[in-house]
């Protein structure tokens, strides 16, 4: 199972495991995304549009901050953990180590764009 780490904003819903088997017999029918509060407004719009224009449910987006999102993402694999995290920075080596220790392997980091506050 691959989980995604998205750098900047989350537009790569197509890469997430929509019906990924998590725990024995457990599944969810939506994508769970956590992360950056600066990316939250854009990610919400993209998620709503995705839900309207695809055969999938609208992803659930939570604003937890980049660090908080990565902490949740790296905590483990299964329906109780998010599928994707948005961050306004790159993943740290220590976060990668935590992910690997908790069974979150094959992380894919995708740079979607840049953000900024003016």
PLM-predicted stretches and their roles:
Residues 18-25:
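Signal peptide processing junction and immediate N-terminal pro/mature segment
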């Amino acid at each position: 199972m691959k989980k995604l780490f998205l750098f900047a904003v989350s537009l790569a819903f197509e890469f997430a495991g929509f019906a990924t088997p998590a725990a024995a017999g457990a599944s969810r029918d939506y994508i769970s995304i956590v992360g950056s509060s600066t990316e939250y407004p854009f990610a919400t719009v993209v998620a709503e549009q995705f839900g309207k224009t695809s055969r999938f449910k609208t992803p659930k987006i939570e604003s937890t901050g980049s660090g908080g999102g990565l902490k949740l993402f790296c905590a483990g694999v299964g329906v109780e953990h998010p599928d994707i995290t948005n961050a306004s920075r790159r993943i740290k080596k220590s976060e990668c180590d935590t992910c690997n220790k908790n069974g979150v392997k094959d992380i894919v980091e995708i740079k979607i764009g840049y953000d900024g506050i003016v």
